[in-house]
Amino acid sequence: MARSPVEPPASQPAKRAAWLRAELERANYAYYVLDQPDLPDAEYDRLFVELQRIEAEHPDLVTPDSPTQRVGGEAASGFTPVVHDKPMLSLNNGFADEDVIAFDKRVADGLDKATDLAGTVTEPVEYACELKFDGLAISLRYENGRFVQASTRGDGTTGEDVTENIRTIRAIPLTLKGKRIPRMLDVRGEVLMFKRDFARLNERQRAAGQREFANPRNAAAGSLRQLDSKITASRPLSFFAYGIGVLDGADMPDTHSGLLDWYETLGLPVNRERAVVRGAAGLLAFFHSVGERRESLPYDIDGVVYKVNRRDEQDRLGFVSRAPRFALAHKFPAQEALTKLIAIDVQVGRTGAITPVARLEPVFVGGATVTNATLHNEDEVRRKDIRIGDTVIVRRAGDVIPEVVSAVLDRRPADAQEFVMPTECPECGSRIERLPDEAIARCTGGLFCPAQRKQALWHFAQRRALDIDGLGEKIIDQLVEQNLVRTPADLFNLGFSTLVALDRFAEKSARNLIDSLEKAKHTTLARFIYALGIRHVGESTAKDLAKHFGSLDPIMHAPIDALLEVNDVGPIVAESIHQFFAEEHNRTVIEQLRARGKVTWPEGPPAPRAPQGVLAGKTVVLTGTLPTLTREAAKEMLEAAGAKVAGSVSKKTDYVVAGADAGSKLAKAEELGIPVLDEAGMHTLLEGHAR
């Protein structure tokens, strides 16, 4: 279905309603039938609410096929239609705390609950609270305890038969257990994919050179609606039961929470993240508690669901045209939204990395107003075909940096401009270069670049570096912008009068910072190396360098071959270290830091060179009792010769040293053809006389 024609203004309600209906139907088709949603949930909800409002104000504009009158979606060709005995309705949505309070008030009024003179409910309603999964709703039919059919929701009245595909989902029992087995039971629930399974699936897709899925919901929907059930069987799908359709041959539980408890006794998977609460306060407490844990959950959710718990009260409240009055879906702030990309700038990172950044028309997404979003690198911009002027989908989840997911291509204006990576750094004018094997372009300005200077100073002061307490980003900004500090060495020249003159920097703060700088002068070699901000050199590598060389000068003058002898230093890291110390400006700054005792550390001798004998780098396993040596003594001798002593035999084992009563390790060595030595043979190797 093509996108709707030009969007009419709100001043033309008839045309606007027709456009909204067409746009929502097109989005429904993409979402339910094609499994290729192209409209963020927040944008769909906004359009849907607008159509509801227009139809409420102009009842004559309501049409029987309006999306407000049904759930959405049509049965796709290739699957047999299934008419639901009981419609699979959607739920009304709430987005703010006020919506939940209003819902509770409507329910209480509908149940004639007692209120005080101010209208506050004094007889709280009992609710069952659950998670709102971001998956695909289905109905499972069991007859006399045996699974016989599964269908998708479809348009709420008619879905698609996906029985064979559902049979492949291990979480769904093919036979119910327990004693209260009904003659017929329609179980309503959600097929979804856990985050870890989604990541593994995309790894397999990449390895096979196949298209990756955008998110777990798309992966679940696409997997479930395969015409070949073998493909579905290869996909890691899961299921949670949360509702009921038809029930025959057993008593309906009195409460919704009781229904879910009963489901568990039948062997159906039910999510444990649920609660029974009372009143609006209980609902909101559950919502905010789940919201705090949302990112740590093993699956995606987009909200929570509230249902009046007592079945008789549900029956009294009944339904409106497309949703039950007794339930509400309380949705989290949308994690994706549409907005316009105004410009693409570039930011310069601490190591000179150039990152394209999208400048956006302000949009509320993920609980915050977003005006900037990362584009990662030049290749990502090209791959996603993102252009200036595009309407784009922006995603912000939790504390993750907002990113541009994709461009909406059929909304692209004729004058949209492609992004061109600048050739000069916007901060210092230095040349920008990109190495052939790297995705990131970098400024070559080193510590001369103001952007890198700020970041380098911030890194230098971090707790795991020189630990300069009180030297935050805002102070660094002022010091650099006022040209008071150009390199880390300048920090130690700062005086009290200079610091108190800074904006919002009191005398006490100035004295504390001076004290911190004084303490930072006495550090360790490992911390100092880490503080320099050498690319690819983290805390662990800095410690290894300090341990291996013992002092700074040998590191600064070490050729690449010597650096490669350091534990866990490979060619890329060695080249990065070598290039850093080869740059004259970096050496000058280091000398300034060391001059006149500004920064000092205890130095030691270099670590003993690694043994180069026949056992160097070999893996040896000890087994049994040796004639004259304890196991520990033999291990020390082997390790001193450069060998690694392992606890089990594998194909990577080079030698097995066996004594009396050697067991399964000896048998495994003989099976794999690994050389087996006695104690005398071990001594021969230790002496360097390989046989």
Swiss-Prot record:
GO-annotated molecular function: DNA binding; DNA ligase (NAD+) activity; metal ion binding
An example Gene Ontology CC term for this record: cytosol
Necessary cofactors: Mg(2+); Mn(2+)
Pfam family, one: HHH_2
Signal peptide: none
UniProt-annotated binding residues for NAD(+): 41-45, 90-91, 130, 153, 190, 307, 331
Keyword Cell inner membrane applies: no
CDD domains named among the record's database cross-references: BRCT_DNA_ligase_like, LIGANc
Stated role: DNA ligase that catalyzes the formation of phosphodiester linkages between 5'-phosphoryl and 3'-hydroxyl groups in double-stranded DNA using NAD as a coenzyme and as the energy source for the reaction. It is essential for DNA replication and repair of damaged DNA.
Designated name of the protein: DNA ligase
Provenance organism: Burkholderia pseudomallei (strain 1710b)
